[in-house]
Amino acid sequence: MPAYRSKTSTAGRNMAGARSLWRATGMKDEDFSKPIIAVVNSFTQFVPGHVHLKDLGQLVAREIEAAGGVAKEFNTIAVDDGIAMGHDGMLYSLPSRDIIADSVEYMVNAHCADAMVCISNCDKITPGMLMAAMRLNIPVVFVSGGPMEAGKTRLANPVTKTIEFKKLDLVDAMVIAADDKYSDADVAEVERSACPTCGSCSGMFTANSMNCLTEALGLSLPGNGTVVATHADREQLFKRAGRRIVELARRYYEQDDERVLPRSVGFKAFENAMTLDIAMGGSTNTILHLLAIAQEAGIDFTMADIDRLSRVVPQLCKVAPNTNKYHIEDVHRAGGIMAILGELDRAGRLHTDAPTVHAPTLGDALAQWDITRTQDEAVRHFYMAGPAGIPTQVAFSQNTRWPSLDLDRAEGCIRSVEHAFSKEGGLAVLRGNIALDGCVVKTAGVDESIHVFEGTAHVTESQDEAVENILADKVKAGDIVIVRYEGPKGGPGMQEMLYPTSYIKSKGLGKACALLTDGRFSGGTSGLSIGHCSPEAAAGGAIGLVQNGDRIRIDIPNRTIDVLVSDEELARRRAEQDAKGWKPAKPRPRKVSAALKAYAKLVMSADKGAVRDLSLLDD
């Protein structure tokens, strides 16, 4: 029977000093026999996805204490990718994932906490906390702040001049701002309407993708990824998480039940999560994060597994930015993540024996929470929770219900396998002489007409140069924009490329151009945008050998990407580059701090999840 970790600092005569300090935090005699639960919050006023979390840690804490535990809250950092984007602030986003994981490890191990409730929401916070959970391997429940309501406005179509009702998100604000056909007044209207409430941005972007994947991993409660941040139903998720973690802690420490530990989800849960990701056309960043989380868990889940799954899993859900018809609030109305998992289960694509924090197995969870099979009216009522359309930064401030559920599996937001949006899923891994270790593309956002595309390389040595060239109309139809030395090591920090892809779209080149980078993309990206090219240029990857005018062929159906240059010519270029050193050909006015330089020294390429190369730390 494992001993409570907290006994290290609360039991025995020698710990009198530590207990004295614990008492100064409010603990009493009777508390020293209870599990100490860390409430890991990520409240910050910098991030709309986290601005409403301030009091929610104490909401969870009250439930923990009512269930017989001791709750102790602390905070991690949180970077807003949208605000950090388009300038050197984005260099810090991906590295912050590792800082978050480390900070959780430091606090939990330093104070010998027995279990955790992780209150996350946005892009790097959920994966950072998941990495920490796997590293620590103590009982954990995740609960997110929830998605933002989609924005809504009426806007004049710049071509037809008719007034159109439009659902909006952050990406619309970026695209319209770069489109000269819209007036300053139009841009201002969209800016004020695109992000109306607290919560993670309203499409299937990285934050929402990751919060949905925690459901498939079995580490959060049903609805975690989809019920909007403003809805009263989300309050119940926080309360249930607080009660549940005390039960899980007791099952592990008092009953020796290792199935409650996060690593017990095993390889099967990672396959389930990736299967869901492919089926819902999630952000390509999820690939990066799942690979990193699997490494922390000691699970051999690789790009090869992702490639294998991408060939057989259909796309069953299509949400912004891949369509302007649906947002996350619409996924919830259709039954949420449990409904997508239910359709995948009927297709034989899930491991339903994987454990969850709220049911013995995923199969048991689906029996209760899949709205197409449940007999529980409370579940159906839960999935009718909808947006109120009232701008607010207050959590749980409304109780609006959709008039009906979306149960249309032929033409609705969530489809059955027989009526899938596409037979192959929304993410794919490509390989070729330009990406020997692979690169990734969100096929859900690529028009079928350019699934096979051959174009001319337009080489840039940074995101800034790419943006400058696109806005100056130097990028033409048929070009493939190369953005290199933006990988984890070369950036450093692996910047997101949402601005260049948004500007390509605003220039009317969304179906006529491609972009290839060793950097990454925002979950808001769509179009033929191929990222995570590995090895990256700074690590000697062939993307660093491409020259202006080279022809490049992209073949998504056959999962290939090649620069159409002979092996002999590539070898000649490699020898030349080896002599010069693998650095950008043009100087970049970029401030790289000591912290970022330290990150660059240890980080590996994207195909390994951009995690640290721990072999470099061996004596």
Curated annotation (Swiss-Prot):
The organism's place on the tree of life at top rank: Bacteria
A GO-annotated cellular component: cytosol
Pathways per UniProt: Amino-acid biosynthesis; L-isoleucine biosynthesis; L-isoleucine from 2-oxobutanoate: step 3/4; Amino-acid biosynthesis; L-valine biosynthesis; L-valine from pyruvate: step 3/4
Biological process (GO), any one: L-valine biosynthetic process
Annotated keywords: 2Fe-2S, Amino-acid biosynthesis, Branched-chain amino acid biosynthesis, Iron, Iron-sulfur, Lyase, Magnesium, Metal-binding
List of residues that carry N6-carboxylysine: 124
Cofactor binding note of this UniProt entry: Binds 1 [2Fe-2S] cluster per subunit. This cluster acts as a Lewis acid cofactor.
Gene3D superfamilies membership: IlvD/EDD C-terminal domain-like
The enzyme's E.C. designation: 4.2.1.9
Catalytic activity: (2R)-2,3-dihydroxy-3-methylbutanoate = 3-methyl-2-oxobutanoate + H2O; (2R,3R)-2,3-dihydroxy-3-methylpentanoate = (S)-3-methyl-2-oxopentanoate + H2O
Annotated active site: 522
MF GO annotations: 2 iron, 2 sulfur cluster binding; dihydroxy-acid dehydratase activity; magnesium ion binding
Summary of subunit composition and partner proteins: Homodimer.
Family that this chain belongs to: Belongs to the IlvD/Edd family.
NCBIfam families reported in the protein's UniProt record: ilvD, PRK12448.1
Name this polypeptide is given: Dihydroxy-acid dehydratase
Gene from which this protein is expressed: ilvD
